[in-house]
């Protein structure tokens, strides 16, 4: 065999190995297991950059596991601000790209919100997570075909848009729909009507479609995310009491604190005398 033939054979072997790797079956992982293994928090968006650890946010484990349950077709999460709702969405997106690819429609309140989230959260996640970096080409890469609002990967495409964009909501078939901050959405996508209904209509041809809807709630009785929550199983996060061992929901009435008011430079200022404590229903 000549040197030229050996080089050609080596190139062919490399090409075949790459092709075979693409046909490798996905790992048998749930979303939280995938995140613990592959997700890295980026320094731009996290106070603790480095490997993702589900144990730091245990209340996200069940929603992430529900996503890989074939019996579950929609997940609704109602939660306070800054408790990990966006990280839930990002972990699900990463899992889809790497493990169960399909078209994703990721809807934010406005297109500007979508652009900002893509730059500050999605792009760093792809850059810092090896499986995603290998499958999603950088926007700046030559011939990548990707933009800030649209990113292709083997088996699917991630499209980010706003609830006020009727064209994107009405024209993009999608197996997966993810709705961020649902209570801040436009009441109508132009003249086309309810943005969520338009988005869900994009899933009509997918037997294995899944939807994720998250938001901080606004006004009780006039909240889209509240309505969606009450249409589901209405599961709530409960904390185990260190005294009796029973699980109880953490509600404001069971949180105890002793405030005191002081005047500082002529203005009333409130502070806590001795911190904050929580008690379960049996010890309230």
Role assignments for model-derived ranges:
Residues 1-282:
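Phosphate/NTP-binding elements of NTP-utilizing enzymes
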């Amino acid at each position: 065999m000549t040197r030229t033939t050996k080089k050609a054979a080596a190139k062919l072997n490399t090409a075949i190995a790459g092709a075979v790797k693409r046909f490798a079956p996905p790992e048998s992982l749930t979303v939280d297991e995938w995140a613990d293994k592959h997700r890295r928090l980026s320094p731009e968006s996290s106070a603790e950059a480095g490997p993702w650890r589900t144990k730091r946010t245990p209340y996200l484990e069940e929603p992430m596991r529900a996503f890989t349950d074939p019996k579950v077709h929609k997940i609704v999460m109602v939660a306070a601000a800054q408790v990990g709702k966006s990280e839930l969405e990002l972990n699900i997106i990463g899992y889809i790209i790497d493990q169960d690819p399909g078209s994703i429609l990721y809807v934010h309140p406005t297109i500007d919100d979508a652009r900002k989230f893509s730059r500050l959260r999605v792009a760093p996640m792809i850059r810092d997570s090896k499986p995603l970096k290998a499958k999603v080409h950088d926007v700046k890469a030559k011939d990548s075909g990707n933009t800030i609002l649209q990113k292709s990967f083997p088996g699917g495409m991630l499209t980010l848009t706003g609830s006020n964009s009727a064209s994107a909501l009405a024209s993009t078939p999608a197996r997966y729909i993810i709705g961020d901050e649902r209570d801040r959405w436009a009441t109508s996508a132009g003249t086309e009507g309810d943005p969520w209904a338009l988005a869900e209509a994009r899933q009509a041809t997918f037997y294995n479609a899944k939807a994720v809807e998250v938001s901080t709630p606004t006004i009780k009785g006039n909240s889209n995310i509240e309505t969606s929550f009450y249409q589901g199983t209405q599961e709530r996060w409960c904390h185990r009491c260190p005294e009796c061992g029973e699980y109880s929901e953490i509600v404001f009435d069971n949180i105890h604190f002793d405030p005191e008011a002081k005047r500082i430079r002529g203005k009333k200022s409130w502070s806590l005398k001795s911190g904050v404590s929580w008690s379960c229903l049996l010890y309230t």
